């Protein structure tokens, strides 16, 4: 008889965002005239940059001609895109990253989960709390944890609390961990990391033989020139870190799907016999076996991000969403909310008013203002009493949402 992966049974009921969608659907069906504004899931609203659209249209025409038609592409991504990424995103910041170390994929979310395929089951995993739920859930699915406890924490994971007291920056653990998830600018809190802070993590990882999974999906929103965009801006990071990036939020590719993972060829981990194994070789083998590459059309669109027109259009998108974030911060602070993030990041992290739980505030906001956000507790036990609002929406909707919220809550 066929059996299942029992680890899936450990998962808490419902992934965060489907649960939000379920509650919103129930409310909308009961209140068909309500004009709901969604500032919850981090999905973009503005159109793809013209440079990307033009390149993709040209690529479609390429597919209509036998001479330029493309079938299966390289699983790692086309060389012309990987070279552009290496030059503009890394080498321009003095990061020692070669095009051959870049793997183009269909999403950073996929890669942060799939990367576990090349790691053993006995690694001690550290995550911040609150944290992007995918990091935790994929480790549960892979059998790297025990059962969930009454606090909503999984046995076997090391949770590093981030809160207002430590400026939402996790402290280096006193114990040894093998894999560390870091996300900066941070989802969900909007916190950022300095070079000195990341250097502490790199030093820790090198001293303990640990690997850092660095999620830089929101690096394009950094406007402070002193802040690092990549873990590879830190000396020694090539020997202890894998970086994940995405075109989703900077170029609006959430529905188009294109991302990348950097695995340095100098990066190694231990085999069961104690020998050092190059992780690049394992990830290359994994991708060649389980992934057929991102479509030619999409990769041409991603390549256009690095054209002069593409750069300007992407920057305009980023500035638009950051202006939304500024509006949200200003309006909520003016109404008396305790607000964090929203600077160098597209997410605003706020303390729920009147000691409401995260989900109670979600329901109250939906019912009274018809606005959707994300309960902080959905990102972990330490997120209880907090709430995330996304800057990814139209200006009209952001202004209307702030008008509704501040009319219902003035603290």
From Swiss-Prot:
Cofactor(s), by name: pyridoxal 5'-phosphate
UniProt binding sites for pyridoxal 5'-phosphate: 72, 108-109, 132, 187, 218, 246-248, 257, 292
GO MF annotation terms: L,L-diaminopimelate aminotransferase activity; pyridoxal phosphate binding
EC number: 2.6.1.83
Pathway: Amino-acid biosynthesis; L-lysine biosynthesis via DAP pathway; LL-2,6-diaminopimelate from (S)-tetrahydrodipicolinate (aminotransferase route): step 1/1
Sites bearing N6-(pyridoxal phosphate)lysine, chain numbering: 249
Sites where the protein binds substrate: 15, 42, 109, 132, 187, 292, 388
Keywords: Aminotransferase, Pyridoxal phosphate, Transferase
Catalysed transformations (reactions): (2S,6S)-2,6-diaminopimelate + 2-oxoglutarate = (S)-2,3,4,5-tetrahydrodipicolinate + L-glutamate + H2O + H(+)
CDD domains the record matches: AAT_like (cd00609)
GO term, biological process aspect, one: lysine biosynthetic process via diaminopimelate, diaminopimelate-aminotransferase pathway
Functional note: Involved in the synthesis of meso-diaminopimelate (m-DAP or DL-DAP), required for both lysine and peptidoglycan biosynthesis. Catalyzes the direct conversion of tetrahydrodipicolinate to LL-diaminopimelate.
Family: Belongs to the class-I pyridoxal-phosphate-dependent aminotransferase family. LL-diaminopimelate aminotransferase subfamily.
Subunit structure: Homodimer.
PANTHER family registered for this protein in UniProt: AMINOTRANSFERASE (PTHR43144)
HAMAP family in the record: DapL_aminotrans_1
Protein's UniProt name: LL-diaminopimelate aminotransferase
Lineage: Bacteria, Bacillati, Cyanobacteriota, Cyanophyceae, Oscillatoriophycideae
Encoding gene, per UniProt annotation: dapL
